[in-house]
């Protein structure tokens, strides 16, 4: 291994930083709708009165608000499933650049919805930015994974999740009543997304196209070699080129991989199952339930200023993503995911106990806060960042876009289900709702322990070869048995 292969060059930092602005958009638009709920509902009511001369019926208001929140995930499902249509035709970088048009259109619709006295404009804007974010959750991990050297792929892949949590935190802070979450400024709160979109439009033209896309998809070896030299900061990129050429030869031996082929072929069935289950482990862990309803959970816990406690959880969220960034290449993906799932299960039990005993023991409110902060911290150790970039690692260049589309669709669909159902399940189960998530977390832990391989320090082709060699006959082996022959020690 050349000593320069671990080098974090300026061009590599620019490429990853430019891409991760899309992740920040995703996080911001996930969190921005919660804080100004009451003032936006008042806008809906005023608009209804102006149109029909009477206050909006409560059931209609609830439906419109639920639609405003949920339509974002519907857009995300459509966007995530469309990833392959763009990245193979236009390239990774150009696809990210083009999609900013959606962000600009959405910003205009939401920003002028109050002036236009139209809640339909706001809902349509939420749908369009949802499509943008769905595409982003495919484009960014794919691009970052393909421009990063093997030894830095996990750490740089974690930056996608860091962008998301920073976006959520910014949305929580901007959404404070004293800043933009008020009657006058909420349209600006929703439309400020044009700023990162504009910044990304400025930066991306200076970022290189994915060298893997150039060599394997376009057969432009000279361009790929030139890009690699800039990304790696060295003239000797022989190892990277050889690895890509081997992957290209393997891809030529395979027929074109469609989404259906991922499930039909024995070589892809296990990795696509792993990819989907890891995405489900992120969304069905209960983290979105905590974020969607954190303010009301803190209120039930007796916290005097719940909105600031929610921001506190956002800070914890960000801090532990940074921790994951520094340890993912040392501890490995699988280990961190297992630690995160186990820790979240323990915190979910604590949260259940605290909420159940709150009326009899007021000091349990403090335990609930500790449990929520712990839950968020363990999420960012593993289940937060790892499912995003490990999908790109599990597949070679050919099936990667289709696999990322399926995984992203699974993520957004489960996100939508949790967002729509949690409130009703919480009303039914009361403080015991997090027991459901505890059971799911334990099941995901068992699956990860027995089925998920360690990808740390391995090239894309080595990981894919492990599945090809193993096939269906290897599916019952432990991750250590499955990947032991690959000689990963030489890569670390």
Curated annotation (Swiss-Prot):
Positions on the Extracellular side per record topology: 34-66, 113-120, 177-185, 294-306, 356-365, 423-429
Pfam families for this protein: Sugar_tr
Source organism superkingdom: Eukaryota
Glycan attachment residues as annotated in the record: 45
Tissue specificity as recorded in UniProt: Detected in brain capillary (at protein level). Detected in brain capillary.
Phosphoserine PTM sites in chain numbering: 226, 465, 490
Subcellular location: Cell membrane; Photoreceptor inner segment
N-acetylmethionine PTM sites in chain numbering: 1
Keywords from the UniProt entry: Acetylation, Cell membrane, Glycoprotein, Membrane, Phosphoprotein, Sugar transport, Transmembrane, Transmembrane helix, Transport
Changes after translation: Phosphorylation at Ser-226 by PKC promotes glucose uptake by increasing cell membrane localization.
BP-aspect Gene Ontology terms: cellular response to glucose starvation; central nervous system development; D-glucose import; D-glucose import across plasma membrane; D-glucose transmembrane transport; dehydroascorbic acid transport; long-chain fatty acid import across plasma membrane; photoreceptor cell maintenance
Gene3D superfamilies, per database record: MFS general substrate transporter like domains (1.20.1250.20)
Segments in the Cytoplasmic topological domain: 1-11, 88-90, 145-155, 207-271, 329-334, 389-401, 451-492
Membrane-spanning residues: 12-33, 67-87, 91-112, 121-144, 156-176, 186-206, 272-293, 307-328, 335-355, 366-388, 402-422, 430-450
GO (cellular component) term, any one: Golgi membrane
List of residues that carry Phosphothreonine: 478
Membrane topology of the entry: Multi-pass membrane protein
Reactions listed under catalytic activity: D-glucose(out) = D-glucose(in)
Record text on activity regulation: The uptake of glucose is inhibited by cytochalasin B. Glucose uptake is increased in response to phorbol ester 12-O-tetradecanoylphorbol-13-acetate (TPA) treatment: TPA-induced glucose uptake requires phosphorylation at Ser-226.
GO molecular function list: D-glucose transmembrane transporter activity; dehydroascorbic acid transmembrane transporter activity; fucose transmembrane transporter activity; identical protein binding; long-chain fatty acid transmembrane transporter activity
Binding site for D-glucose: 161, 282-283, 288, 317, 380, 388
Function: Facilitative glucose transporter, which is responsible for constitutive or basal glucose uptake. Has a very broad substrate specificity; can transport a wide range of aldoses including both pentoses and hexoses. Most important energy carrier of the brain: present at the blood-brain barrier and assures the energy-independent, facilitative transport of glucose into the brain. In association with BSG and NXNL1, promotes retinal cone survival by increasing glucose uptake into photoreceptors. Required for mesendoderm differentiation.
Quaternary structure and partners: Found in a complex with ADD2, DMTN and SLC2A1. Interacts (via C-terminus cytoplasmic region) with DMTN. Interacts with SNX27; the interaction is required when endocytosed to prevent degradation in lysosomes and promote recycling to the plasma membrane. Interacts with GIPC (via PDZ domain). Interacts with STOM. Interacts with SGTA (via Gln-rich region). Interacts with BSG. Interacts with SMIM43; the interaction may promote SLC2A1-mediated glucose transport to meet the energy needs of mesendoderm differentiation.
Family assignment from sequence similarity: Belongs to the major facilitator superfamily. Sugar transporter (TC 2.A.1.1) family. Glucose transporter subfamily.
UniProt protein name: Solute carrier family 2, facilitated glucose transporter member 1
Organism: Bos taurus (Bovine)
């Amino acid at each position: 291994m050349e000593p320069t292969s671990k080098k974090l060059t300026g061009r590599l930092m620019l490429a990853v930083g430019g891409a991760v602005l899309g992740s920040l958009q995703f996080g911001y638009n996930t969190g921005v709708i919660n804080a100004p709920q009451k003032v936006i509902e008042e806008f809906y009511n005023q608009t209804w009165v102006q149109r029909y001369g009477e206050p909006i019926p409560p059931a209609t208001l609830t439906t419109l608000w639920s639609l405003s929140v949920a339509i974002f995930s519907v857009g995300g499902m459509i966007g995530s499933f469309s990833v392959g249509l763009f990245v193979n035709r236009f390239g990774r970088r150009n696809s990210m650049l083009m999609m900013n048009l959606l962000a600009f259109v959405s910003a205009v619709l939401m920003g002028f919805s109050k002036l236009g006295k139209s809640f339909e404009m706001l809902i349509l804007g939420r749908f369009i930015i949802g499509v943008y974010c769905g595409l982003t959750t495919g484009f960014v991990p794919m691009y970052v994974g393909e421009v990063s050297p093997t030894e830095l792929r996990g750490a740089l892949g974690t930056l996608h999740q860091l962008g998301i949590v920073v976006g959520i935190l910014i949305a929580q802070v901007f959404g404070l009543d004293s800043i933009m979450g008020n009657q006058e400024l909420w349209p600006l709160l929703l439309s400020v997304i044009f700023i990162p979109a504009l910044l990304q439009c400025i930066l991306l033209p200076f970022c290189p196209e994915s060298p893997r896309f150039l060599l394997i998809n376009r057969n432009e070896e000279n361009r790929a070699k030139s890009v690699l030299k800039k990304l790696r900061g060295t003239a000797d990129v022989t190892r990277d080129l050889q690895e890509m050429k081997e992957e290209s030869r393997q891809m030529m031996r395979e027929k074109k991989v469609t989404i259906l082929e991922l499930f039909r072929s024995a070589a892809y069935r296990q990795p696509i199952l792993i990819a989907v289950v890891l995405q489900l482990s992120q969304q069905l862990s209960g983290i979105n339930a905590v974020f969607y309803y954190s303010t009301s959970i803190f209120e039930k816990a007796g916290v005097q200023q719940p909105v600031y406690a929610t921001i506190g959880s956002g800070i914890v969220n960000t801090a532990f993503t940074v921790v994951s960034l520094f340890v993912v290449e040392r501890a490995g993906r699988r280990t961190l995911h297992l630690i995160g799932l186990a820790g979240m299960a323990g915190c979910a039990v604590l949260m259940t106990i605290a909420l159940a005993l709150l009326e009899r023991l007021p000091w349990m409110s403090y335990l609930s806060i500790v449990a929520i902060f712990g839950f968020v911290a363990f999420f960012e150790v593993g289940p937060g960042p790892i499912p995003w970039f490990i999908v790109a690692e599990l597949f070679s260049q050919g099936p990667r876009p289709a696999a990322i589309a399926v995984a992203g669709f699974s993520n957004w669909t489960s996100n939508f289900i949790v967002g729509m159902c949690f409130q009703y399940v919480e009303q039914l189960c009361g403080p015991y709702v997090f027991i459901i998530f505890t059971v799911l977390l334990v099941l995901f832990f068992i699956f990860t322990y027995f089925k998920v391989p360690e990808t740390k320090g391995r090239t894309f082709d080595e990981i894919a070869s492990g599945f090809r060699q193993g096939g269906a006959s290897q599916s019952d082996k432990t991750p250590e048995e499955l990947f032991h022959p690959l000689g990963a020690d030489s890569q670390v």
